[in-house]
Amino acid sequence: LKKTGAEILIDALAQEAVDVLFAFPGGQVIPIFNALYDAKDLKIVLVRHEQAAAHAAEGYARATGKVGVCLATSGPGATNLITGIADAYMDSIPIVAITGQVPTSYIGTDAFQEADLVGISRPVTKHNYLVKDVRDLPRIFKEAFYIAGSGRPGPVLIDLPKDVSVATLENYQYPGSVSIRSYSPTIVGHPKQIEKAAEMIKNAKKPLIFAGGGVISSGASAELFELAVKINAPVTLSLMGLGAFPGEHELFIGMPGMHGSRTANNALQETDCIISVGVRFDDRVTGHVGSFAPKAKIIHLDIDPATISKIVKVAIPVVGDAKNILVALNKILGTREVSEWNEQINKWKGERLFSYKHSEKSIKPQFVIEQAYEMTKNKDAIICTEVGQHQMWTAQYYKFARPRTFISSGGLGTMGFGLPASMGAALAQPGKLVLNIAGDGSIQMNIQELATISINRIPVKIIILNNEYLGMVRQWQDLFWDKRYSSTCLRGGFLCKDCKGPGHCKVKYVPDFVRLAESYSILGLRATKHADVVPVLTQGLESDGPAVMEFAVTPEENVFPMVPAGKPIDQALEEL
């Protein structure tokens, strides 16, 4: 069977069961798009910016666990993918990014739209390839999908020169298996280490489970639930772990860290045994590392040995797949009765994990999230967010019940992530309700994707919490920089030293999100007072197709609790 490099690419996507490709064309990938013209059973989504293609591939992967795929041309097209690739790398998301490249004979000559993508992407990919011979292409594609989706997942980049994409391979056959001598992830945890972990858990007086995105990647939520209930241990989840354990369960104590619950942070500081599963002890969780969990011995279950004892000292490491390890651990452990530790947790917890000052004089952003939760909690909805205050309020007030229902940028914290990610999630899970919760700052980073959403009639429901600020940066300026709001007001511009707040500003706020939505043939709705919130949400959520719902929220509302950077996590600031 004879095929060109471009045709091999199309067949590889079919062999790997890829059903959606997020792409933008250009000169060096014309042969690939020519082959795509005849592709069957593959939906090609033409984005409006390559960064959005990478984030959409992430959204697809985060919603399904399958490998997401994006395609861009050489030079600026490829470099525009890098932010999304870096985002996937930080959050361990499996994507394959395919980039065009100048012909092999031109590489190194500073040719038109040439960029060293292998060099640029090396720090933010799990692996990358520059294909120099069409005979290598079938093997490279097979390896790329395997590497992206196995072990600790992550992005893989394939840089494909134009001459390779038009070259012909005689006797083409797609490989049935992969053999990479230098890559062999440990899947099964060592039995002796699992036994040691079980013994430490049995002897613990104050056990605490701290789980993260690795539980979701592994598909280990059921096993995590079994462990928690069996040993009656409170559960705290990292931002990436939300949904791995039911948010309304009595053992759940919220997210820890900078904007985590006081209950979770207190528990981390008082526990004598942390059972950590698929987490990396990010600085936003630990706060001042030297003061983190001072009384605890830490058991760390993770598929990536490089994460163990990288940030905090671990007493018992267990390397392997979280699901396999938890299955083995659950077989050994017996049940544990409710103890004084559980009673202490419940005292800290009180009636609710997070609270804010309610008001009907303005729209509180937390209230919008709470109402969105009440309206969607029984609909198996997927909630995406951008990055900023709204992201933290969503993590605090939306009680995620299942894995792969919260999709957000964690490690890189990428503004502009949510809108394209929600496109990818909606296309990955047709028929499911998908929301994108955004701030007025973040949404404008990739707002051009409203065109992609409109043209493809992707039924994403977009909630914009418009406080007319870059809210999270403004909050830091408010709390730590004497309210010097430099370049954070989205109404007035760079510096308004006599500023009395958006309500007193003579400058008109732009854009008008309702009219902007309508210009893309998308339903646009706006709430300007407390009483508008439920009607606007109801109309938007019940509408056919995509909808933009803008809420004019309290401008200078802050996210609390807040642990100042570098401080111990039990020294959080609270709302005055």
Protein language model regions, located:
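Thiamine diphosphate
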Residues: 98, 106, 112-113, 309-311, ...
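N-terminal alpha/beta PP-like core and its mobile active-site loop of ThDP/TPP-dependent enzymes
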Residues: 1-336, 371, 375, 459-462, ...
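Generic enzyme active-site microenvironment
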Residues: 157, 300, 384, 437-438
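Short acidic loop-to-helix transition motifs that present clustered carboxylates
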Residues: 29, 50-55, 390-392, 529-533
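Flexible, glycine/charged-enriched surface loops at secondary-structure junctions
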Residues: 153-156, 335-348, 361, 548
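Short glycine/proline- and acidic residue-enriched helix-loop micro-motifs
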Residues: 124-127, 179-182, 346-361, 498-500
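Active-site diphosphate/adenylate-binding microenvironment
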Residues: 9-10, 14, 32, 36, ...
